[in-house]
Each structure stands twice: as structure tokens, then as C-alpha cells.
């Protein structure tokens, strides 16, 4: 079996052809996060700690997903870094904006350049962009995605049932998400969130 970039592209193409055969035409992948610590929550899901190598993997993955006839979703903008798991609580990202410019944005820029039609925004509170709201609910973070990175595709939230946004009522989170600039909302809590 092929390894490295060729292996990644071949496996990604195969997996996404299987998704399409099942009627699934959007894949919540690839993970574009740069994680430098093997003990971090996102590390096992990321392509690693080097922004340049992660960007190469993201480009290959987006191309293979597209070649399979499936739409790729770049996640978790603006970059997860070494933050805590937002499935189980609030994650505060205290890194300076320059870190995002020099590292975290690069895989997203590569994925956008490769033609990914979707970007998923995380629930991390990224203090250098908006110290009050999770990224998914923050107009400032969405402005960075649209204006600084030039993304003109579809923006979606991470799952609004995650603990990182539980301090908001279901309907409040949905409204804030739309007002922030999300085009689509994800929720796994259908009974409570769909009426919003």
C-alpha cells in the first residue's frame, strides 16, 4: 500500500467514494488543526504539529474528497491548537493573533485554495479575536475567515449540543450562530434544537 501523501490521497479517495455510494455527499473532513503536543485532545485527529506539512496533507485530502464527488469541510477554524476538548467544556485560547497568522491559518488557506466549499468553525473562545464569545458565535472570527482568508463558501458551526456552548439556551445559540455569519448549523440534539 502507498504511504505518505500518495497513500493519504488513495485512502481518502476510496473512503469518500464509499460515502458517496451510501448517499453521503458532504464529509466533515479534513481536520486542519495544527497540534504540537501528543497529549492534546485534537492531536490524534490532526495531521500533526507542523503547519506546512499539515497544509500539504489538507491540500491532498481536499483534492481526493473532491475527486470522489464529495464536498470537503475544513475544520476547526480558526485552529484548535493545544486547547481543551470543547465536547466536554469551554476552551479558552490565549495565543496571540500572530500564532494564527504564522501557523493555524496556513492549513485553512491551503484547503480554501484547493477548493473546499465548507469551513466549520470551532467553539473555542479565541481571546485575540473575541474574548467574549465562542468562535462559532463570534462575528469577529467570521470576519477573519471571510475578509482575511477570503473564504466565500459555506460556513457551518461545530455541534451546538457540545458543552462549550451549553451556557446559551438552544434557541439563543442558534440565533447567535446565524447572526455571527454561519450559513448552516450543526446539532446532534434534535429534540431540543430543531424547534429553535
Predicted regions and their residues:
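Surface-exposed, active-site-proximal loop segments in enzymatic domains
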Residues: 1, 37-47, 86-89
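Active-site-adjacent helix-turn-beta-strand microarchitecture at beta-sheet edges
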Residues: 5
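Second-shell residues forming the walls of enzyme active-site clefts
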Residues: 49, 53-196
Amino acid at each position: 500500500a502507498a504511504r505518505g501523501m500518495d497513500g493519504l490521497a488513495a485512502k481518502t479517495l476510496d473512503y469518500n467514494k464509499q460515502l458517496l455510494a451510501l448517499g453521503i455527499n458532504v464529509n466533515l473532513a479534513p481536520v486542519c488543526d495544527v497540534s504540537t503536543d501528543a497529549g492534546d485532545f485534537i492531536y490524534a485527529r490532526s495531521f500533526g504539529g507542523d503547519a506546512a506539512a499539515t497544509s500539504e496533507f489538507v491540500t491532498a485530502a481536499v483534492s481526493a474528497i473532491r475527486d470522489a464527488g464529495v464536498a470537503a469541510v475544513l475544520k476547526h477554524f480558526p485552529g484548535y491548537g493545544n486547547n481543551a476538548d470543547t465536547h466536554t467544556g469551554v476552551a479558552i485560547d490565549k495565543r496571540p493573533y500572530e500564532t494564527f497568522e504564522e501557523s493555524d491559518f496556513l492549513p485553512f488557506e491551503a484547503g480554501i485554495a484547493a477548493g473546499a466549499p465548507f469551513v466549520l468553525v470551532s467553539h473555542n473562545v479565541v481571546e485575540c479575536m473575541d474574548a467574549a464569545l465562542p468562535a462559532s458565535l463570534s462575528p469577529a472570527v467570521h470576519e477573519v475567515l471571510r475578509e482575511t482568508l477570503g473564504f466565500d463558501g459555506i460556513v457551518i458551526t461545530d455541534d451546538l449540543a457540545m458543552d462549550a456552548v451549553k451556557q446559551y439556551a438552544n434557541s439563543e445559540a442558534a440565533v447567535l450562530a446565524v447572526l455571527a455569519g454561519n450559513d448552516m448549523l450543526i446539532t446532534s440534539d434534535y429534540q431540543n434544537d430543531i424547534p429553535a
